[in-house]
Amino acid sequence: MAARVCCQLDPARDVLCLRPVGAESRGRPVSRPFGPHPSPSSSAVPADHGAHLSLRGLPVCAFSSAGPCALRFTSARRMETTVNADQVLPKVLHKRTLGLSAMSTSDLEAYFKDCLFKDWEDLGEEIRLMIFVLGGCRHKLVCSPAPCNFFHLCLIISCSCPTVHASKLCLGWLWGMDIDPYKEFGASVELLSFLPSDFFPSIRDLLDTASALYREALESPEHCSPHHTALRQAILCWGELMNLATWVGSNLEDPASRELVVSYVNVNMGLKIRQLLWFHISCLTFGRETVLEYLVSFGVWIRTPPAYRPPNAPILSTLPETTVVRRRGRSPRRRTPSPRRRRSESPRRRRSQSRESQC
């Protein structure tokens, strides 16, 4: 599995190197001076590697399980590498990169190729990793000749191998956290996986539904509900993904790679956004308990052999009608009167009619 990336100061070149570090590393302080620049052939670094940087003011979060700190790239937009192969980095990595002003563009290319990924699991020669530097919280590092801005390294890695295993490798190694966006709502990713991918409407239809039903609440500065907040975040994430796909389509020269990245975003990430949008819109429309009950009912139905289940799957819109529990007691008075029954002419009515005829 891929190793984490940590910062390593090279006093000979007065630059910071990004080096892989094992997940067990927590940066225990050591008193030894900084050693020589390790050779590129090393696949990992010791657990206490880079801990000396704490003496120079590097924040503790550089060694936490949440992820290391790294250089803030002011002009970098994309870094690209290939597993087990050399890949020329795009020329957008200019000398303006903080902390690396003394290095040429060619040095930057070799620098990242040698230091960035060294302990990635062998997934094949065709697997490409697209790494986009987004940003994060900043810290100060007091060093000569001037203070440098630092921040958490925040990466989005889109792997061209659309498998669950590859996706976990691409993302799980960065944070090491088990985050389920449905957990606080009583559901889980596994529960949503009961529904097939073609069950969820298109993102355009879901966005139109959210806009038609909850636009005022979504645009409101007030906190309406956790579902409204989650909807806002999902809509914003999809907008950023669309910007990313548009940028890749415009700047990636290789048509095959461009198609792979755009297709991966639309299919894999698009499915996750569709699930999120559907879940929160449905919870706001039908109620969370009804949606959870529907997920369980659908999961039971689809996992039952066809010979032993009803021909039609449960429908969320009709589920509340079959699960309403009415209280005992007098039923409320109906507003619409019942149709009058035709009365037979009784002797009393006949007598009244005879009297009227006499008058």
Curated annotation (Swiss-Prot):
Ranges where the record places region Disordered: 25-48, 312-359
GO MF annotation, one: DNA binding
Biased composition (Basic residues): 325-352
GO process annotations (BP): DNA-templated transcription; microtubule-dependent intracellular transport of viral material towards nucleus; symbiont entry into host cell; symbiont-mediated activation of host NF-kappaB cascade; symbiont-mediated arrest of host cell cycle during G2/M transition; viral genome replication; viral penetration into host nucleus
Superkingdom of origin organism: Viruses
GO annotations of cellular component type: host cell; host cell mitochondrion; host cell nucleus; T=4 icosahedral viral capsid
InterPro entries per record: Hepatitis_B_virus_capsid_N (IPR013195), Hepatitis_core (IPR002006), Transactivation_prot_X (IPR000236), Viral_capsid_core_dom_sf_HBV (IPR036459)
Protein name, as recorded: Putative X-Core fused protein
Species of the source: Hepatitis B virus genotype C subtype adr (isolate Korea/Kim/1989)
Record lineage: Viruses, Riboviria, Pararnavirae, Artverviricota, Revtraviricetes
